[in-house]
Amino acid sequence: RYAYVSAHFEGFTDHILAILDMSETAKPRLAGRWWLPGMWRGGGETPTWRTGKRYALHHALVTGNLAYAAWRDGGLTVIDVTEATKPRIIVHRNSDPPFGGGTHSPLPLPDRNLLVLADEPTSAKCSEGLRYIWMYDVREPGNPVSIATFPQPAEADYCAKGGSFGPHNLHENRPGSFQSSRLIFATYYNAGVRVFDIENPFQPRE
């Protein structure tokens, strides 16, 4: 019934979460919205993040009544969408600082109480540092715990190769596609496509 969309509304600094009621597919209706504090400039909010950082929803994936949302330099949120008209924040986690931000792709694995989260590079030749794929234990949605990072491709010097190096998109186990809670497919800009085995979530291996 509902679609969970990244949208830029007037008065906001960037993209936020919009929940659309698709009961009438020809007439989608806005049911609810959620944003990080500081994004609604038109409502008198003031951005709290550092100059040069971008707080913007890339996208959210929903499993059950929980939306796992990636906010670029704003990190990760887990949002309760039980009431579409009143989405409610459960937790906000941000690894920037000390890590570089760019949170891009969430992948919840509900059958294992895990979340894979990829941070995207935004510069060439690793000039802003490396970006990572993170593994979170989310058995307690209000307390996601980072338990591992995925190994970085190391068979070549990809930072020196030119262009961007680091994680980008994850295969999202969409209906009708290949689905796995053990094999993780990740694009890596100039390092191609990588497949990781997470049978042991504490030690992902390529």
Spans of model-derived segments:
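Feature marking well-ordered beta-strand scaffolds used for ligand recognition
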Residues: 1-206
